[in-house]
A protein has these predicted regions:
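Short, hydrophobic transmembrane alpha-helix segments
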Residues: 66-80, 324
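Loop-centered beta-sheet repeat module
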Residues: 184-245
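Extracellular/periplasmic helix-loop-helix junctions in multi-pass membrane proteins
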Residues: 259-265, 318-335
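Central hydrophobic cores of alpha-helical transmembrane segments in multi-pass inner-membrane proteins
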Residues: 82-101, 150-154
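Membrane-interface helix-loop-helix junctions at boundaries between adjacent transmembrane segments
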Residues: 106, 110, 128-210
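Membrane-interface helix-boundary motifs at transmembrane edges
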Residues: 102-113, 162-173, 229-241, 291-298
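Structural signature of hydrophobic alpha-helical transmembrane segments
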Residues: 78-91, 139-147, 208-218
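N-terminal membrane topogenic signal
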Residues: 40-59
Length: 367
C-alpha cells in the first residue's frame, strides 16, 4: 500500500504531465501560416563539381550569348560562326555519344540491336524521304527533333539537379517541367509559326491565336513565381543550381528567336547544349573507363582531355566537311548525312536513363 505522502507527491507531476500534453496538442494544432516564416535554405549540390558545373553546364549559356552578340551586334558572318560551331562543337559532341556507344565494346555487345538497328534505320530514312519527294519533310523532322533534343537535355540537367538537391515534391516537379517547356518552346513558336512562317517555307500561321498563347505564357510565369514565393515563405530549400540553369538558358532562347532567323538560331542555342554534353560525357567516361576493357577508343579518350579533343575534332571533320559539300551537290547525300544527327537524337533518348541503369548511376556518381 502506498503512503499518503507518496500519493500527494506524485499528483502534481501527473497534473504537470497532463498540462504539457495539452500544451503540445494545442501547439501542433496551430496552423502553420501563423508561425513566423523560416529563412530560406540554400541547396547547392552539383552534378560534376561547382567549378565545372558553373563553367560548362550553367556557364555554357555565355557561349550562346557570345554568338548572339557576334552576329547581331558585331555582324560577324553567320557562315563563319556556323562552321566554327559545326566542326568544333556539334560534330564533336556526336563523337562524345559514339565514344560510349559504338566505340564501347561492352555497349556494342549489350545493345547491338539498339545501336546498329537505329543507325541502319535513320541512315536509310533520309534517302528514302528524298526519293519520294520529302526533302522538306526531312528538313522539318531534323529541325524539330534537334530543338527538342536541346531543350530535353536542359530538362535532363534540371532533373539531375533536382535529384542531387532532394527537390522532388510532385507539385514542384510538374511546375518545373511545365515552366521550362513553355519558356523554351514559345520563343521559336512565336517567331516561326506566328510572325515569320516564311522563314521555314510555311504557308500558314497561328497569328489569330497569339493573344491566347501570351495569356498561357503569362499564366505560367505567375503560377510558377507564386509557387516559388510560397516555398521561400515556408523556408523550403532553394535549389540554386536549378535556378541558375534556368537563368542562363531561358533568356538566351527568348533573345535568340527575337533577333535571329533559324540559320543564326541553330548554332546559338545548340552550342550551349554541346558544351553541356561534352562536360557530362567527359565526367561519365572518366569514371566508367578507369577500369575494365571497353575498347581502344574509350580508354584513350578518357585518360587525356587532349586526346578526347583531338579525336573528336578529327571525327567531326571527317564527316561534317564532306557531308556539307556532298549535301550541296546531291539531295540523296544530304539525306544520308542527316542520319548522323537522327541516330544521335534517338540513341541519346535511350542511353541516359539513370533510373534503370545502375552502371550509369555509378558513372555519374548518383548512387
Amino acid at each position: 500500500m502506498r503512503s499518503p505522502e507518496s500519493s500527494v507527491s506524485r499528483e502534481p507531476d501527473a497534473r504537470r504531465g497532463c498540462k504539457l500534453d495539452a500544451l503540445a496538442a494545442v501547439t501542433q494544432a496551430v496552423p502553420q501560416s501563423v508561425l513566423p516564416s523560416s529563412a530560406p535554405r540554400w541547396a547547392h549540390r552539383w552534378i560534376i563539381g561547382r567549378g565545372v558545373d558553373l563553367t560548362f553546364v550553367i556557364g555554357s549559356a555565355l557561349a550562346g550569348y557570345a554568338y548572339l552578340v557576334a552576329n547581331v551586334a558585331l555582324h560577324v558572318p553567320i557562315s563563319l560562326l556556323w562552321w566554327f560551331w559545326s566542326v568544333g562543337f556539334d560534330g564533336t559532341h556526336i563523337f562524345g555519344m559514339a565514344s560510349r556507344t559504338f566505340f564501347d565494346a561492352e555497349a556494342r555487345q549489350r545493345n547491338r540491336t539498339l545501336l546498329f538497328g537505329s543507325a541502319a534505320f535513320f541512315f536509310a530514312l533520309g534517302p528514302a524521304l528524298i526519293l519520294i519527294g520529302g526533302k522538306a519533310v526531312l528538313a522539318m523532322i531534323v529541325a524539330v527533333w534537334a530543338y527538342y533534343h536541346v531543350i530535353r537535355q536542359h530538362y535532363g540537367f534540371m532533373v539531375l539537379y533536382k535529384v542531387k538537391n532532394r527537390d522532388l515534391a510532385k507539385t514542384d516537379s510538374f511546375l518545373d517541367r511545365w515552366f521550362l517547356g513553355v519558356m523554351t518552346v514559345f520563343p521559336p513558336f512565336h517567331r516561326f509559326f506566328i510572325h515569320h512562317p516564311e522563314e521555314l517555307g510555311l504557308k500558314f500561321s497561328f497569328a489569330r491565336m497569339e493573344p491566347f498563347f501570351w495569356v498561357l505564357v503569362a499564366a505560367t510565369v505567375v503560377v510558377y513565381t507564386g509557387r516559388q514565393v510560397l516555398r521561400i515563405r515556408r523556408g523550403d530549400p532553394i535549389n540554386v543550381p536549378k535556378f541558375l540553369l534556368f537563368a542562363g538558358v531561358i533568356p538566351l532562347h527568348w533573345l535568340t528567336f527575337a533577333y535571329m532567323s533559324w540559320m543564326g538560331a541553330v548554332p546559338t542555342v545548340t552550342i550551349v547544349h554541346n558544351l553541356q554534353y561534352h562536360a557530362l560525357i567527359w565526367f561519365h567516361n572518366r569514371n566508367r573507363y578507369r577500369v575494365g576493357d571497353h575498347g581502344l577508343v574509350p580508354k584513350a579518350v578518357s585518360r587525356s582531355l587532349l586526346n578526347y579533343v583531338l579525336v573528336a575534332l578529327v571525327f567531326s571533320a571527317l564527316y561534317r566537311v564532306p557531308g556539307f559539300h556532298l549535301g550541296q551537290a546531291s539531295d540523296l547525300a544530304f539525306g544520308f548525312f542527316c542520319g548522323f544527327g537522327l541516330t544521335h537524337y534517338y540513341l541519346d533518348s535511350k542511353i541516359w536513363r539513370v533510373r534503370s541503369d545502375p552502371g550509369l548511376r555509378q558513372a555519374l556518381q548518383m548512387a
